Amino acid sequence: MWVDFFRPKTPPAVKSQIRPWVLRHDIALCEPVVCELLRSAAARERSVIQRHFATIPVLATPSTVWTEATTLGQRCYDAGVMIGALDLLIATVCVHYGARLVTFDEHFARIAKLSRLDASILPRAR
């Protein structure tokens, strides 16, 4: 969702759809999302993103989350569900803090079926 929020070429309908979510007072970020977004942001966009993120609480990634993410990844793998490491971390941080994950990425629904992840999968506006 954050990539779409900051990407200049995102269709206006999608930006309108996610704006209420990213401007909520109870929103939080996790460190893997910050890493994922800033690692691929164009140099001219980074300061805008960092200023926006500076206003949002960031959920830390305790060392135990890495082990829990590994276990979740193994559970997914055993169920035939292949999930990238960063998405496993994002899901596990959300479970650790009891935070709901709001996303367009449908593979988080598969993770939710195999874990305690509370995921809201938004249909992408057209």
Could you tell me what each predicted segment is?
Residues 30-33, 104:
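A secondary-structure boundary/capping signal
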Residues 28, 59, 120:
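General small-molecule cofactor/ligand-binding pocket signal
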Residues 1-29, 38-51, 125-126:
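Short, well-structured N-terminal submotif of metal-dependent ribonuclease cores
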Residues 101, 116-119:
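Hydrophobic beta-strand scaffold residues
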Residues 2, 34-37, 108-109:
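A generic structural signal for short hydrophobic patches within well-formed alpha-helices
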Residues 5, 16, 57-106:
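Active-site neighborhoods of divalent-metal-dependent phosphate/nucleic-acid chemistry enzymes
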Residues 79, 110-113:
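A beta-strand edge to alpha-helix "cap/lid" segment located at domain peripheries
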Residues 118-126:
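Short, C-terminally biased terminal segments at protein or domain edges
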